[in-house]
Each structure stands twice: as structure tokens, then as C-alpha cells.
Design a protein with these regions (language model features):
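Short hydrophobic beta-strand element within catalytic cores of glycosyltransferases
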Residues: 324-327
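Conserved donor-binding/catalytic core segment of Leloir-type glycosyltransferases
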Residues: 217-235, 241-244
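A conserved catalytic-core segment of Leloir-type glycosyltransferases
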Residues: 28, 35-103
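Short alpha-helical donor nucleotide-sugar binding micro-motif in glycosyltransferases
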Residues: 286-287, 294-299
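Conserved acidic donor-binding segment of nucleotide-sugar-dependent glycosyltransferases
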Residues: 340-349, 357-362
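Aromatic "clamp/platform" in nucleotide-sugar-dependent glycosyltransferases that forms part
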Residues: 307
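Nucleotide-activated donor-binding/catalytic signature segment of Leloir-type glycosyltransferases, i.e.
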Residues: 269-287
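Carbohydrate-associated surface elements
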Residues: 172, 194
Length: 402
């Protein structure tokens, strides 16, 4: 089966979890027998990828302006930046030309998120192949529960209504699509994200020199809490800071690591000062490779405080590195994990209570770590690929009957 996969990023040229999810999903689909052409909107090569053909749609270098997650910034102006729109339009023109060659014509078109939906619709019109839109996040998610950018809503609506099938990364995301875009429920299938434990096995060797001061705090009995995310309103980080401040009043031996960057960075730094917790909160910036590994490894507890998180792959990564998990109920990953503590994102009292519990009860912390570490290994991309391939075959079969 030949799949034309339309995406916006692949590691290492990625700004978030979308590229990671697309990479491992495509790898698992290729292993299941799919022949994939993956089209990216930038000029950087992916010569290390041998399980699919990566096609460069433009001569633009990968840049932060391609970030699909900055819609909150765009929404302030109620328009898309000229940079990102020009990349989109160039991407669409490339797809038109690419499909002129019969050998490039697919059996299935698989478009990831709003940035590639217009290209997906055009590819469907040219080839007659079924279009599957894979929703990793809606504009309502990206705007932190607000309305967001009307241009993006329009693209999402057209993409969803013109698709033969819609994959949503969680029940939570499916419910948002049903509520906001009023589509037939039978059109939407929940396809969870996953993790490939073997992909993390090669980076297990922790280097205790990376976070020496945090190591020192741990020798003094501190519990280390961390989150790894983009600093945007969607992620609920101000709620996390408020809860951490409340918890640390009762248990001063707590430290918080914030890994990532984004438009809220300065606001969050000011918030820590306002709450009087600056000496306990550590901003690392965006991390990759060994420093990324070490941030997970030094931590005891991982918090996902999102206002609305379609899935949340970082929670599975944290479980791999032996963290207990505290996850907002508004995060999709909470639908597939049992051995975690849950709370509503706005309930800072509940989150503070959870933080106190895990930081003062070694047995609870140990049990949560052990439970979720066993559990996360069953959530694999190979299982998700089987589900997707089965659905692709079903869609093909339905198309032949028409």
C-alpha cells in the first residue's frame, strides 16, 4: 500500500511532539508493509531515514516560523504570518506538481494537522485517493481553551469535512472535534499516540554532572519535580507554579525543573518571583540529547499541567525514566494510563495535595514509579500501526464498493 504522508516536521528538525509522533508512526507503518512518501515543507535532508522516502517540498530552511504550535501568537493578530502562509502555499504547489507523475500517486493520503490539510484536499481531488486527516491538536487546544485563530479554524473545518476518515489522538480530542466542528461521529476514530521503548534504551546512561546543584539538593532530601513542554497558555504552567508554591510551603524540600521554552517564558520567570519560589524553580531552556535525558533521569515526579493536551508523549518518556506521573484530566495520555495521579488543570489545591503526597510518602512514590513503568511499555507504535493499517484497508475496501 502506497501512502502519501503530508507532515510538517521530522526529528531532528522539529519543534515539538508532532514530528516525533510522525516519525515513529511512519516507521511502524513501514514495518507493517506500507510504502511511504513523507513530504516536509523545508529543505533539510533526512539521509538517516531509510524506511520511507522523505521529500522536500520547498527550498526554505527549517525555522521557528514554521512552528505549528504558535497559533496563540497568531491569534492575537487574527491572521497567519506571511512567512508560514507562504510556506503553506509553496507546499500546496509542490504537491500539485509531485502528483503529475503517475508513480507518485498514492492509495491513501494521510495528512497531519491543519498545516497540511489544504494540500491533502488538493491531493485527494487530483488522485481520487481517500484522505485521512490525523488531528494531533485542534486550534481550540492550541489556544488553551480559547477560540484561537479563525483562519486556522476554517482550514481545520474544511480539512475535516473533506476527509474520508479523521484520526483523533484521544477521546478528548474526538469530543472537541464533535463539539466544535459538528461532524458525524462515525467519521472519527481514536488513534492514540505511543512510544517505542527501544528508541530510548540507547540513551539511558545518566550523567550526574549535568545538574550538579540539583544532585546536591537530592542529597539533602529534596524531591525533584519536572515538566518538559512548550511555554504556552495551553500548558497550564501558571497553575503548576501556584500549586508548587502552595505545596512547598508545607514541604520546603522540593525543587521544580521547567524544561522548554516559548512565548510565556518571561511571564513564568516573573511568576516564580511573585510567588517567592525563584530559588526552587530552575529554567533549563529547550534540551536535546543527553541533557534532555538527564533532566528526566534526575527527576522523581513528572507533572503534565495542560489546560488541554490532545495526547502528551512526554508523559510516556518520563515513565521510561522512572518518574511518577501527575497528569491533568484534560490530557489525552490520562486515558491510557492507570498508575498515575489525576486532577483538573484548574484545581491547584488538588495538584498541591498530590505534590505533597508523593514528596512525603516514599512508598507512594515508589509504587507509582513501578506501576507506570510496567504499564507504559504496552503502549507501542507497532500496535497503533496495526490499527491504522486495518483502517486503511477498510477505507480502501469501502471505496471499491462505491
Amino acid at each position: 500500500m502506497k501512502i502519501l504522508m503530508l507532515g510538517w516536521e521530522l526529528p531532528p528538525h522539529n519543534s515539538g511532539g508532532l514530528g516525533v509522533a510522525c516519525f515513529y508512526m511512519a516507521k511502524a507503518l513501514a514495518k507493517a508493509g506500507a510504502d511511504i512518501d513523507f513530504v516536509v515543507p523545508y529543505s533539510e535532508k533526512h539521509d538517516d531515514i531509510n524506511f520511507m522516502k522523505v521529500v522536500n517540498a520547498t527550498d526554505f530552511p527549517f525555522s521557528s516560523y514554521m512552528n505549528p504550535y504558535n497559533s496563540f501568537t497568531f491569534s492575537k493578530h487574527h491572521t497567519l504570518t506571511s512567512d508560514i502562509r507562504s510556506v503553506q502555499l509553496s507546499y500546496i504547489e509542490f504537491i500539485k506538481k509531485y502528483l503529475e507523475d503517475p508513480k507518485n500517486r498514492p492509495d491513501i493520503i494521510h495528512a497531519h494537522d491543519w498545516l497540511t490539510m489544504e494540500a491533502g484536499i488538493i491531493a485527494k481531488n487530483i488522485t481520487g485517493a481517500p484522505l485521512i486527516s490525523h488531528i494531533h491538536a485542534t486550534e481550540f487546544d492550541r489556544s488553551g481553551g480559547g477560540y484561537g485563530n479563525p483562519q486556522v479554524h476554517d482550514i481545520e473545518y474544511k480539512g475535516i469535512t473533506n476527509s474520508d476518515k479523521v484520526f483523533a489522538v484521544s477521546k478528548n480530542t474526538k469530543d472537541i472535534i464533535l463539539k466544535e466542528y459538528k461532524v458525524d461521529e462515525s467519521k472519527i476514530e481514536v488513534v492514540y499516540n505511543a512510544i517505542e521503548p527501544s528508541s530510548l534504551a540507547t540513551i539511558n546512561d545518566y550523567d550526574d554532572r549535568t545538574f550538579r546543584y540539583i544532585e546536591y539538593l537530592k542529597t539533602k532530601g529534596y524531591t525533584v519535580v519536572m515538566t518538559l513542554t512548550r511555554f504556552t497558555v495551553q500548558k497550564g504552567l501558571t497553575y503548576l507554579l501556584e500549586a508548587f508554591a502552595r505545596a512547598s510551603q508545607k514541604n520546603p524540600k522540593m525543587a521544580l525543573i521547567l524544561v522548554g521554552d516559548g512565548e510565556q517564558r518571561n511571564e513564568l520567570i516573573e511568576k516564580t518571583a511573585e510567588l517567592g519560589i525563584s530559588e526552587k524553580v530552575f529554567f533549563t531552556g529547550f534540551l536535546r540529547g543527553e541533557r534532555w535525558r538527564d533532566a528526566y533521569s534526575i527527576s522523581d515526579v513528572f507533572v503534565m499541567s495542560s489546560v488541554n493536551e490532545p495526547f502528551g508523549l512526554t508523559a510516556l518518556e518520563a515513565a521510561h525514566f522512572n518518574n511518577a506521573l501527575i497528569i491533568s484530566k484534560q490530557s489525552g495520555v490520562s486515558e491510557v494510563l492507570k498508575n498515575i495521579l489525576r486532577y483538573d488543570f484548574w484545581d491547584t489545591h488538588k495538584l498541591a495535595s498530590h505534590l505533597l503526597a508523593v514528596s512525603t510518602s516514599p512508598s507512594l512514590l515508589r509504587d507509582l514509579k513501578r506501576g507506570v513503568k510496567k504499564e507504559y511499555t504496552t503502549i507501542t507504535w507497532s500496535k497503533i500501526a496495526e490499527q491504522i493499517m486495518h483502517k486503511f484497508l477498510s477505507i480502501q475496501s469501502e471505496g471499491r464498493k462505491k
